[in-house]
Amino acid sequence: MIRRLPILEGRLQPALILCLILLAVPAAGRPAEVHAPDVKVRLVTDEADMALAILNERAERGEASPQSWERLWKSEGFVRLKKRQEAFGAKDVEKDFRDFLGSAKPLAQRDALRQALELWKHLGVPAAAQRAAAYLPPGIPLRATIYPVIKKSVNSFVFELDTNPAMFVHVDPQKSSDSLENTLVHELHHVGLAGCPKPPDFDRMSAAQKKAFDDLGAFGEGLAVLAAAGGPDVHPHATDTPEAWLVWERDVAGFSVDLRRLEAFFRDILAGRLPAEEENRQLISFIDAEGVPQGPFYTVGWKMAAMVERARGREGLVKTVCDPRTLLAAYNEVAADHPRRAGEGLALWSPDFLAALAPPHPRGG
């Protein structure tokens, strides 16, 4: 399942006796954890548990008790979600949740939401974390708390990647467990990638080179697609609909054209020809195909990474993930030997473009 670049951002059972809710809900919200040398991922469902409890109380009694609302406000998931929303300028977050959970739509969906949340609770979080970590360099930590949340907006996003990484994932009744796990791997890989150090030459880069380097990080979408699939020989949409499969095949077929379009975009950044607003508009256009989170950063990034892994193994690919410039160079070397078809090989990154991404070597020793 393909997910959107996280940097672009871009609430259960009533009781005839209230104390039964109090006893049941905390157990449901207990976090599941997975630990490994560089992996610590928690799944915390308390916000969704409390939201479902409110919906169930509404169904049983017509309204939820003040105590139930207070438990929602104090849940770890809601506290962090509110902090994130307020960081983006939201006002009256609690009122918005009251209005949403008091409306007809979530009440009508409560059985479907309960089933969707149960899928999350039985999801293979340890396996998903290890699949994401398999495409990260040794020593890069993968730390995250995953919050399946019931909320009005259907988007999912990350927060506080530099300090206490959180993933907020919309509880979607339409998702299968396989699709959810692929989404989880994809987003966890983004979280891990955010822990990469800057390259040694970053401080010597010009402002334009730093912009280009940061935007090259969007190829992390393709890397995350590969990690979620589990390898270069597994179709990225193996768990999706035939329609999604066909759209992916259509877009991958435009690889060479899209590579040249991306190079032109980065050349404009390096030359200082793009105002910030236009740069962002074009960047988004490369990760959003007709409203679908897919585009050249996904397809070109995936194909480059898949070819490098096939030719050099996963270890060879993983060496490139923290510096996307090395991925482009590795792809060029692999693609130069790729079999030709119809008299034309795969498009390559221009040598002068790759050279322009690096700052001059320092003088002297």
PLM features: what roles do these ranges have?
Residues 1-10:
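N-terminal secretory signal peptides that target proteins for export/translocation
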Residues 10-15, 31:
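A cross-taxon signal for low-complexity, glycine/charged-rich
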Residues 13-25:
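Bacterial N-terminal signal peptides
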Residues 30-103, 346-350:
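N-terminal mature-domain "stem" immediately C-terminal to a signal peptide or N-terminal signal-anchor/transmembrane
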Residues 51-62, 75-76, 135, 191, ...:
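Structured segments of extracytoplasmic/periplasmic soluble domains
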Residues 70-79, 146-154, 245, 325:
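Acidic helix-start/capping segments at beta-turn-to-alpha-helix junctions
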Residues 98-248:
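Acidic/His-rich structured neighborhood in mature extracellular/periplasmic domains
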Residues 247-365:
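Pan-zinc metallopeptidase signature
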